[in-house]
Amino acid sequence: MKSAVFYGKHDLRVEESAKPAVGRRDVLINVKACGVCGTDVHIYEGDKGAADVTPPTILGHEFAGVVEAVGSDVAGFKPGDRVCIDPNHPCGCCEPCRDGINHYCEHMTGYGTTVNGGFAEYCSVDMQQVYKLGDHTSFEQGAMTEPVACCLHGIDMCNIKPGSTVVVIGGGMIGLLMMQLVKNAGATKVVLLEPVEGKREVALKLGADLAIDSIHEDVPARLKQEGVGNVDVVIECVGKPVTIEQAIQIAGHKATVMMFGLTKPDETITVKPFEVFQKELVLTSSYINPYTQRRALELIDSGRLDVSSMVAKVASLDELGAILSDPALRAMGKYIIDPSK
């Protein structure tokens, strides 16, 4: 089968690989769509992403497709089913798993990180991690389920209430998803900070009340000018020290600051403890997607969440290397890989 194999920093090779074996509990999926994630970029750049990778490995953890075959112990799935996956497979036996925090599993299997993933024509996945797509969900939308599930976990930790004022920093795919989820959670005023005009325009179409150029405008002054009062929640979706510091600066009294964007492991931020104390800020973060996959699927299938407007292109495996290596390409939006192209 055709696959994109990661051999090390800046070394991704599109090559023929053996079709995966199907174990007793496995579902063999013919991959139709696999999203390119920021974690894939971190791995390609040699940084530590959300999981360790031991090359050679087929990357890709956001994918959907058609069931090709099932193992002898598999129940609930059959060839022809349209499915997507939750790529984070906990062991169920370690202390975190037994304590109900299995996203901190000590022996986590990660499809597309610790084992082969979806940047290939086929991937074999444990049945526990497979979900059927709704009738109204395309493969490209199904591939977006995992990032939506991650966003939901972050939203759950933000304490958003009806009437809340929320600022989202970053208008990439994650920021645009967060913005919509914030609206669904009941926030009445949602502001997006994003330097790229095209992304600000998409945000306004998706329901943002205000979109501010975060580089060329004085953000606090613009918020005041537009009558934005106390900011209850700030969700940082960029993963850069400067934007995390900005989030703390613009957060209002008793606000929650969600640090959602993935930084590099050695990066640091400068925080004035007195500012945190004076405003009674809650600084928090979220990690992957515990128990949120089903909710993500239902939001997408119901049409309550637009996961298509931020997609720049459905590309081929041969284009993946360029996408991972070129920030200008990624700035255009979300890329979905179709291994059959």
Question: Where do the model's predicted regions map?
Answer:
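Residues in the short beta-alpha loop(s) of Rossmann-like NAD(P)-binding domains
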Residues: 195-196, 263, 289
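Glycine-rich cofactor phosphate-binding loops and adjacent beta1-alpha1 units
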Residues: 158, 205-280, 340
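Glycine-rich beta-strand-centered segment in the early N-terminal region that forms part
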Residues: 20-34, 48-95, 134-136
